[in-house]
Regions:
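Bacterial signal peptide processing site
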Residues: 22-25
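C-terminal motif of bacterial Sec signal peptides marking the signal peptidase cleavage site
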Residues: 16-20
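First exposed extracellular module after export/assembly in secreted or surface-exposed proteins
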Residues: 28-170
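Hydrophobic helical h-region of N-terminal Sec-dependent signal peptides
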Residues: 6-14
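Positively charged n-region of N-terminal signal peptides that target proteins for export
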Residues: 1-4
Length: 170
């Protein structure tokens, strides 16, 4: 009898142990203050002339946009993860208009050169991924003061356009 009571007590304690680990909460994790402008973007780089006419598809790449550690609503990071020009710097944003720009900013921590970003926009739901599903899109123009390609190949700056990465293999 003692054996059965011990087994029942052990089973009861184990069941309490499993339910004690079950945390239920109505707490929402939330997001950042600029959540709609942040993301991983699959982009195409275009060579454009001073009038904004596309002269050539230059290359494809990846761009990341993300918030600052202080969760600022006036600036965000833009980073190409070394897929083209190896830049990572802060751009000024207008979150309500979903626009961004930067005037003469060091584009990396080493101070290799300066970048200028103009006409930056995040367009919510305006893009389509490769499967035709709607997604957010990004567009901006950028130039680098240490870039010899524009003079060498006869264009003025780059236009970068793309869509938010869906997380699926495209």
């Amino acid at each position: 009898m003692k054996k059965y009571i011990s087994m029942m007590a052990m089973a009861l304690m184990l069941s309490w142990g499993f339910t004690a680990c079950d945390v239920e909460t109505d707490e929402e994790p939330g997001g950042t203050n600029i959540e709609q402008m942040c993301g991983n973007w699959d982009v195409m780089w275009y060579a454009v002339d001073a009038s904004g006419n596309v002269l050539d598809e230059w290359t494809d790449g990846t761009i990341f946009t993300f918030n600052k550690a202080d969760n600022s609503t006036t600036q965000m990071w833009i980073d190409d993860q070394n897929t083209y020009w190896a830049f990572k710097f802060l751009v000024d944003i207008d979150y309500n208009a979903k626009t961004f720009s930067a005037t003469e900013r060091d584009y990396d921590a080493a101070g290799s050169g300066k970048a200028v970003v103009t006409n930056g926009k995040i367009l919510l739901g305006a893009g389509k991924n490769l499967h035709g599903a709607p997604c957010d899109s990004i567009t901006f123009e950028i130039s680098f003061d240490d870039d010899s390609y524009p003079a060498k190949y006869g264009f003025d700056h780059y236009r970068v356009e793309g869509v938010k990465h869906a997380g699926f293999t495209e």
